[in-house]
């Protein structure tokens, strides 16, 4: 998932695998899906950030917020996606253990489908 989250890429060549080739065009793009959606800059009072940078900002500055999330199921762009997002949103939160300074990062992945037999080892975060 680093090709989507770290590179904010929608190009299957960045994956270095052929599991998604069927959905890619001749350049390797899967359209306005996955990394493309995460990389779009949005305007916040703290400045312009994409979704990944916003998650990192919030985890650093307000780790107990219930608003730390991403969503890449953008209805406006679905017609330009070669593959509708299967894993379409993430919600993050931080918890603190009682009587301890230990913090735990929790993540909840929402997905509409999961190809367990064909792609489970590629599609997990």
What are these regions (language model features)?
Residues 1-125:
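Terminal, non-catalytic protein-protein interaction segments that mediate quaternary/complex assembly
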